[in-house]
Amino acid sequence: MTDPVSRLPGLAVIGGGPAGLMAAEAARAAGVEVDLFEAKGSVGRKFLIAGKGGLNLTHSEPMPGFAGRYGARADEVAGWLRDFGPEALRDWAHGLGVDSYVGSSGRVFPMDRKAAPLLRGWVRRLKDQGVRFHVLHRWLGWDDDGALHFATPEGERGVHATAAVLALGGGSWPQLGSDGGWVASLQARGLEVVPLQPANCGFDIGWSTHFAQRHAGAPIKPVVAHWFDSTGTGHALQGECVATATGIEGSLVYALSAALREAIARDGSAMLWLDLAPGRDLERLRRDLGRPRGGRSLSEHLRRQAGIDGAKAALVREALDATALADMDRIAATLKRLPLRLLRARPLDEAISSAGGVRLETLDDGLMAKALPGVFCAGEMLDWEAPTGGYLLTACFASGLRAGRSAARWLRQRAAGQGPGAAADH
């Protein structure tokens, strides 16, 4: 379509990530005409990035533990998952010819671990079903006359739609289109948006120059992280992390990012204690390290007697001064409880995902904006977060399905004169 202003017969879906594609599929399955608009030259770019190291589609963790991974929004996301949970997602992928398996960690992957075949099959099926794709259409908000306003290579254009699903992503991948540029447009129309923050992100610590230069990129595993929540309750989680030039990142840190962010906001910094020797208790470490060292260096002694070397040994040197490094009891205690003070989260554009977004209380159960009848929101632009491990993708799919079905139902009711008379033109 090249007209400066055009009118769609049904639903406009804005955003070609998993949430938008699923919304388009759900609405089209309900018989609605669907036009999907994508800012980039092709859809699913972040989805493809997620598949670079092996596409983690979902997780095999059973309910209610699975839903609990969504933290403060567990109840709301659980409702979406009842319609489209991890097993339904695997069945859906199978319908596209992509079988999956459960890895040793409980994560679910396609058999070939690739994202591209699934995405190609999905887009092909959507096109066969009649979904119309419009790439290089970057949404700018609404025109003065209520039309959806897009920037295209041919210039700006307006599109009037009876209903719209917004699946615009969070703010953590600006190079792929998820830049949070939609926030002001939605706030101007009465939707409350929780500020976007980095989630599944690294944190700054402030290493010495020596440590940063020698050990950036080094794995720190296995470890057990200990921390306290806002009530003073202690928690522990085993996993692995990676030293960076400025601090730490990795799956263990990502799993704690919400709690760490909250602590930094509350106290100015967050404390994390790492057990660097989870296979040995303190008394055993004291005995092992108390053996005669002879002429061996401290590094060699730690390696031989406690299996501690590389970045773990360097962390001990970061934490203790020269006097303490001569005391094997102090070293043993530090190995079991190495203190790390986290100063700040890394910037949003470095994060895997974002927290914050459209506050769910401003939407109805069908994810329609209460202030904008006919406008639905889905995916990472909503105010929820989850750790890596397949939980992010699953909720994006599930919220897209919920929004697409709800939009189709709203359009049917409106056509029958049963619903509100307002449209998605605002």
Per-region residue spans from a language model:
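Residue-level recognition of phosphate/Mg2+-coordinating polar/acidic sites
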Residues: 29-30, 40-42, 63-65, 82, ...
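A conserved short coil-to-beta-strand element within the FAD-binding core of flavoproteins
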Residues: 135-147
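Short beta-strand to alpha-helix junction loop
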Residues: 77-85, 104-124, 173-178, 205-208, ...
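Glycine-rich loop(s) and the adjacent beta-strand/alpha-helix scaffold that form part
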Residues: 163-209
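Glycine-rich FAD pyrophosphate-binding loop
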Residues: 12, 28-52
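An active-site-proximal "capping" alpha-helix that borders the catalytic cofactor pocket
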Residues: 23-26, 182-189, 394-412
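Beta1/beta-strand and adjacent pyrophosphate-binding region of the FAD-binding site
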Residues: 4-19, 35
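Short hydrophobic core segments
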Residues: 12-14, 37, 139, 158-174, ...
